[in-house]
Amino acid sequence: MNLRTLSAMAVITGASVMGATPGLTQTVPASQVRAINLARNTAVAENGGLTVYRPQPCMFQTSSGGGDCLVNQDNNGYTFQFLGGAPGWPENGSSPTTETEIQIAPDGRTVNEVIYNGSPR
């Protein structure tokens, strides 16, 4: 049996030619993904919608759980702090117009508190 035969058998049986390769694992808990999505969507709604407001790019980094925007995670939940502004503000170099700090419950399903939503501090 040669490599070509083994490869053909793997394709026929549906087995991976590479063998047991490590798969992608989610290191960010589902509650944290829910939390970043809820925090981002709450800020968008509070600031007039996507036609006039876009949050800082870190609020779209669900695979890293919010990256630099996640400032605290404890028994009270997830706290995010991030800037926002007119659509395209980070890409075109214009200044942000809004800063939002928001705490989401530990399960990621409810807003505990909008701590701050106003001009950048």
Question: What residue spans do the PLM features occupy?
Answer:
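Residues embedded in well-ordered secondary-structure elements
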Residues: 14, 28, 69-71
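N-terminal signal peptide c-region/cleavage motif recognized by signal peptidases
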Residues: 20-22
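Short, non-transmembrane alpha-helical segments in secretory-pathway proteins
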Residues: 26-62
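Bacterial N-terminal signal peptides
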Residues: 9-18
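Bacterial N-terminal signal peptides that target proteins for export
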Residues: 1-10
